[in-house]
Amino acid sequence: MSAREPAGRRRRASTRPRASPVADEPAGDGVGFMGYLRAVFRGDDDSELEALEEMAGDEPPVRRRREGPRARRRRASEAPPTSHRRASRQRPGPDAARSQSVRGRLDDDDEVPRGPPQARQGGYLGPVDARAILGRVGGSRVAPSPLFLEELQYEEDDYPEAVGPEDGGGARSPPKVEVLEGRVPGPELRAAFPLDRLAPQVAVWDESVRSALALGHPAGFYPCPDSAFGLSRVGVMHFASPDNPAVFFRQTLQQGEALAWYITGDGILDLTDRRTKTSPAQAMSFLADAVVRLAINGWVCGTRLHAEARGSDLDDRAAELRRQFASLTALRPVGAAAVPLLSAGGLVSPQSGPDAAVFRSSLGSLLYWPGVRALLDRDCRVAARYAGRMTYLATGALLARFNPDAVRCVLTREAAFLGRVLDVLAVMAEQTVQWLSVVVGARLHPHVHHPAFADVAREELFRALPLGSPAVVGAEHEALGDTAARRLLANSGLNAVLGAAVYALHTALATVTLKYARACGDAHRRRDDAAATRAILAAGLVLQRLLGFADTVVACVTLAAFDGGFTAPEVGTYTPLRYACVLRATQPLYARTTPAKFWADVRAAAEHVDLRPASSAPRAPVSGTADPAFLLKDLEPFPPAPVSGGSVLGPRVRVVDIMSQFRKLLMGDEGAAALRAHVSGRRATGLGGPPRP
């Protein structure tokens, strides 16, 4: 680096050599901490491993006092004779290192460590007793969105008998769960997932109309359309903030919503309903297969996270890092003996074929298909619709404020709130993966009695806590409930819309998980397998959309922090790693979109609808504003109070200070190249080109 470069750039590209968490680590699978991490995250690439290695290396090294020859001789004479042998074992030669490396990793990719007893025992929440949690809650922490409750109140009851063949969403192919073919007999599979009984509960045209109606939404905050719309003006898209940052320029917001629909709902509908003529029943078969694959991956990742490293002891620093991450994760696997169908192998890949690729694409937008939502029952249908609508509005609002060619227009308060949103989304997604892993295990092993299976069927747990988890309400309150967060919400229109989207996902996931618990039946209610299956599939739909929205937030965080130079975005210490683990487990359900790919898609959408970004404000008569104050009123009950005062997210760190972790875990190869170009002083080519003349 040249001495003439400004100090700020030297801080961005530190010349400090990266420290290794374990001394003399061999280049192979390794021993100690890196051997443990490779056992946990072995897969398509080593990005998680490299980032975690830097997490250990970023900690300040232990200071050692320099000793002279006399002091070293005195210390050596005072040491016991066995210390020399112990030291020689700590510094093995190449052959010994290779042998320890082999012993310290799994023999092959299909073998999964069974983990220590504390990882195998316990229920849905791990070692925490759900009954003890219920005793501490005292009251319900589930606070559904008032807008959702209003929509649910006006939703008519299901009328499956009145749905004709022409309204059923197209031809129905025989349902199947590909990953379980040959492993589960047909009758048992149909009992676990009765896909053949999932007939449409309402007419598709009816659900399509209802998705375009949003009670309580003023002009400017449009609901999800059924098809691409031309309400936005073409030409220049102005990104300057209004004088009052609590509102949006109406024209820019409409243009952002047009872009959002083009890359989400319109993209999935164009690829399925219009081009390939895929039926909603095929989408549901894919969803069931993807959820089972996800459950397997969630079990494998959780087991590896809690497994003891074999072949070597960890040093103190590495052991503490491992302990902290294992204690923070929500992935608490059920014992292998209880779920043999989940624990029979290692990580599974996504379903192959063009249809599966389409269903995993478009930022997780499968729930925007009215024919798919029509297959759900009333509560799950409204929950999926509401989550889709609010995340669509939030995506449009983000695209009305963030653009690679107008980064200067982003406000500090907007950049600061993004990290808080990502924190909550990562915890929600991780807890949903854990829930799906447990409920799928319970469905596939109906004769196994396990505390975790009993917990997910415990209605009072899911009435008391969203997703039945104290960690979710803890993360929500920690990120969005303090004074600084409330101030950010009140003083920014974008932050209000983002908060409403998080609240909608909270409401939707709480609704469908409670629906599953009720469908499991009790002494006063019959078991309803079809309703339970619909709840599981609805959770998969909402999780897929949550992941697409989270990738949108990640793209905006990286744009603000790395291309815009903002230091305001902060995240919990383990949020990048937590979200990367979720993305690894959910690959069968969702094809992630890196920031570089996201902005390339946005640029293509802007060219399609003829929009050109500019860092200016619109002039009269198109300078009217839209106020999301109605969402602030909706957010009054959110977030609920936490169950305990402990931290779920860990210490907050600035994104610019952990850019190497962000780059390796969340940005992908193209984003990494863009970041390197930006740090070196050249334009971040992966994040957009100059505006068109």
UniProtKB/Swiss-Prot annotation:
Post-translational note: Phosphorylated by US3. This phosphorylation is required for proper nuclear localization.
Region (RNA-binding): 50-75
Keyword Zinc-finger found: no
Principal localisation: virion
Entry keywords, A to Z: Host cytoplasm, Host nucleus, Late protein, RNA-binding, Transcription, Transcription regulation, Virion, Virion tegument
Cellular component terms per the entry's GO annotation: host cell cytoplasm; host cell nucleus; viral tegument
Renumbered ranges of motif Nuclear localization signal: 63-75
Annotated localization: Virion tegument; Host nucleus; Host cytoplasm
Motif (Nuclear export signal): 647-670
Biological processes annotated in GO: regulation of DNA-templated transcription
Note: Expressed in late in the infection.
Subunit structure, as described in the record: Interacts with US3 kinase. Interacts with UL31 and UL34; these interactions seem important for efficient virion nuclear egress. Interacts with UL41/VHS.
Comment field on protein domains: The nuclear export signal is CRM1-dependent.
Function (record text): Tegument protein that can bind to various RNA transcripts. Plays a role in the attenuation of selective viral and cellular mRNA degradation by modulating the activity of host shutoff RNase UL41/VHS. Also plays a role in the primary envelopment of virions in the perinuclear space, probably by interacting with two nuclear egress proteins UL31 and UL34.
Family of the protein in this entry: Belongs to the alphaherpesvirinae HHV-1 UL47 family.
Listed name of the protein: Tegument protein UL47
